[in-house]
Amino acid sequence: MPKQKTHRASAKRFKRTGSGGLKRFRAFTSHRFHGKTKKQRRHLRKAGMVHAGDFKRIKAMVTGL
């Protein structure tokens, strides 16, 4: 059976944490900030963690991490 290849787009979007989780970046951060409050913009700066329901599927895509 051939080796599973890393999904390159996913590898660029997710990073492995020290405890084995996957860190992700927030959506809605590229433009149109005038419609968002200061609090929304501040919270969008922080990275989030991948939810448990998505973890198994994403982990299979980013085999190299």
Swiss-Prot record:
Transmembrane segments: none annotated. GO terms for molecular function: structural constituent of ribosome. The keyword Coiled coil does not apply. One of its GO terms (cellular component) is cytosolic large ribosomal subunit. Gene3D superfamilies: 4.10.410.60. Residues 1-20 are annotated as: Disordered. GO terms for biological process: translation. It holds the Pfam family Ribosomal_L35p. Keywords: Ribonucleoprotein, Ribosomal protein. Residues 1-16 have a biased composition (Basic residues). It comes from the Bacteria. InterPro entries: Ribosomal_bL35, Ribosomal_bL35-like, Ribosomal_bL35_CS, Ribosomal_bL35_sf. This is Large ribosomal subunit protein bL35. The lineage of its organism: Bacteria, Bacillati, Bacillota, Bacilli, Lactobacillales.
